[in-house]
Amino acid sequence: MKQLALLTLTLLYFAAVALGQRVAPGVNPGHYQQQQQQQPQYQQPQVPVQPQYQQAPVPQQQQQQHQQPPQGHAPHHGQPQQVLNANNIQQEKAHIAEHMDVPIDTSKMSEQELQFHYFKMHDSDNNNKLDGCELIKSLIHWHDEEKHKHAEKNPDEPDKTIYTDEQLENIVDSVMRMMDANGDGYVDYAEYRRSGVEENRRDDYPNGRP
């Protein structure tokens, strides 16, 4: 009797185990265990995070340096950048002709051109100003002209000096006091025109030309 009860309990135990595993009849339970082991494990791929670099702002001074246009050369002899403008083109023609050693036809020049050319003729350092030495040279030029005229009219008379050195010095001092309006020790072309010296020269040359 005890053996029958033990056998019944054993059968019930195996039946409970079989129902717990839910294995189909006739199928080896190890087959399911192998499938569970062979199932791939899917992992979410990790996307690498790229660091975001923020561009540093360019200093404003550096931008201005790159944006600045190339500067031109400095004006020649202190003249404005637009030297060949319509206002002084006639004067600049004589100026350029003198610098390039081009023969100048004074017969086709206006009175203003002649005045400017005469002024520039004595501007030896080409700074558009006449200093004391250049004024003396201009006076010597007048002096030589007078000597030449006197020698042509009186060929038999001996050569004589019209102005002494002291007279030339006094004349230069007088001209400076009369023409040097701003007192800088120079006579520029504007001061020359305002002084009325060209009127005296026009009296010496009625035709307006030497």
Swiss-Prot record:
It comes from the Eukaryota. This is Lymphotoxin beta receptor inhibitor. It is found in: Secreted. Inhibits multimerization of host lymphotoxin-beta receptor (LTBR) and downstream NF-kappa-B signaling activation. (Microbial infection) Attenuates activation of host NF-kappa-B signaling and production of proinflammatory cytokines, such as IL6 and TNF, during Zika virus infection. Reduces recruitment of host neutrophils and macrophages into the circulating blood and spleen in mice infected with Zika virus. Up-regulates expression of host AXL during infection with Zika virus and promotes Zika virus replication partially through increased AXL-mediated entry of the virus. SUPFAM superfamilies: EF-hand. InterPro entries: EF-hand-dom_pair (IPR011992), EF_Hand_1_Ca_BS (IPR018247), EF_hand_dom (IPR002048), ER-Golgi_Adhesion_Reg (IPR052110). Changing residue 123 to A: Enhances interaction with host LTBR. It comes from Aedes aegypti. Ca(2+) 1 binds at residues 123, 125, 127, 129, 134. Thermostable. Female salivary gland (at protein level). Gene3D superfamilies: EF-hand.
